[in-house]
């Protein structure tokens, strides 16, 4: 099912439909400031397992989307230096790797207690997380075509994944450049993958 949500004024009624789907262990596809992404509630172990299977790479790391930095600090260890980096660069097209706190369920973690965190500069993505009241587990929607790595058209995404997810949010054409990944678990920030933005 394709649900149209406009970024400049997200409809509360449509956001409620998205939240209800997520609270029923559903997976949704939603727009971000980089590429379209799968999302499910951090609280739903069942949905996290389904998301891993849907991606076909069960051991690949998943990322957690937050509404703001205060929410990040509830789930990750954030010292003053890390806080300053996050404040300068978020919201934005970054994935920061941080040490997870005990509030992050084991199902959402890999072998080490590190998670990727995102605060997208996209009003729909942040409105969904805020309305849900908890972070979302997320993973990029990849394209099977090796030339076009990320699918940007929500209608094509719905055709491809509509049967596998509860709904697809149509927030307009997406981007096809992924996030910049920065590891903040060491003494100095380390760029793991160059992406859409430069670290400030």
Question: Where in this protein do the model-derived segments appear?
Answer:
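Active-site-adjacent structural elements in enzyme catalytic cores
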Residues: 1-200
């Amino acid at each position: 099912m394709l649900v149209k949500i406009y970024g400049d004024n997200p409809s509360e009624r449509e956001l409620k439909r998205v939240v209800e789907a997520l609270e029923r262990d559903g997976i949704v596809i939603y727009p971000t400031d980089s590429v379209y992404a799968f999302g499910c509630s951090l609280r739903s172990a069942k949905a996290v397992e389904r998301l891993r299977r849907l991606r076909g790479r069960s051991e690949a790391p998943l990322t957690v989307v937050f509404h703001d930095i205060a929410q990040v600090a509830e789930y990750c260890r954030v010292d003053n230096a890390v806080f300053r980096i996050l404040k300068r660069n978020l919201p934005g097209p970054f994935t920061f790797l941080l040490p997870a706190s005990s509030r992050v369920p084991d199902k959402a973690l890999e072998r080490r207690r590190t998670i990727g965190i995102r605060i997208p500069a996209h009003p729909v993505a942040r409105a969904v997380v805020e309305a849900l009241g908890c972070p979302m587990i997320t993973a990029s929607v990849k394209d099977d075509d090796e030339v076009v790595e990320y699918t940007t058209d929500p209608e094509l995404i719905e055709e491809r994944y509509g049967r596998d997810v509860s709904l697809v949010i149509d927030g307009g054409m997406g981007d096809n450049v992924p996030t910049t990944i920065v590891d903040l678990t060491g003494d100095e920030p380390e760029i793991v993958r160059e992406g859409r933005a430069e670290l400030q």
